[in-house]
Amino acid sequence: MSSIRNLSFLLLSLLVIACGSNPQPEQAAGPDSLLIKAQELARRFIITDGHVDLPYMLQEKKVTISEATRDTLLSTSMGEFDHARAVKGGLDAPFMSIYIPVKDQAAPGYGMALADSLINQVEAIVRVLPEKFALAGTPDDIRRNTTEGKISLPMGMENGAPVGKDIARLQYLFDRGIRYITLTHNKDNQICDASNDTTHTWKGLSPFGRKVVAEMNRLGIMVDISHVDDSTFYQVMRLSKAPAIASHSSGRHFA
């Protein structure tokens, strides 16, 4: 009890000192100085973006990466990413999103054919522009690529549906470069329940989904809890042996 009183007295003393010091307010920084500071930080540190929808956008626009279409990746008004804007903004390692829509998760193969196609697109970017882009599967890859002046293209898969009902597919996806998996998208799948679906099929993770999380931990694939419902989130937090990520969401909203 005495230790609690001592701690309370210490906190109260600090509060009184803080209130009585009456420091002069700092001059608010102007927009120009803030921009300069931001640019300085962007040069000093490696910056990543957890979710860039370039591969699926190319698929939707029916753009096949080749020598004839390479300029689309250098500078374009189509989409939200190109080399010029990445360099200007100091973006070093944008995660290419291998996005599997809900319609594909219910199809034969659970969307694996689309996943392969989108991964092929990312690999084609590196083949066509090897002086600008490089694949990355580890932090060391990203550091090396950054030192060489290249933008790293790590990959994450949005929607775990392509895992199907075969846990071995996780090894295949890892070997193809996938380093995080968003467990589901806008509808419940075979792994877990989604935040936008009121069905609550599994009341969180399915029995298979629990095995998926454990195998992702073993392989080194990050568990992404964007799009999952509350029950799934809490179950992942209890089950996962590694920190989970929210690749493109805050507590309640998507970025």
Features from the language model and the residues they span:
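Glycine-enriched alpha-helix->loop->beta-strand junction motifs that scaffold or abut catalytic
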Residues: 90, 178-180, 239-245, 250
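Histidine/acidic residue-rich metal-binding segments in metalloenzymes
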Residues: 167-175, 197-245
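Bacterial N-terminal signal peptides
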Residues: 8-17
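Bacterial N-terminal signal peptides that target proteins for export
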Residues: 1-8
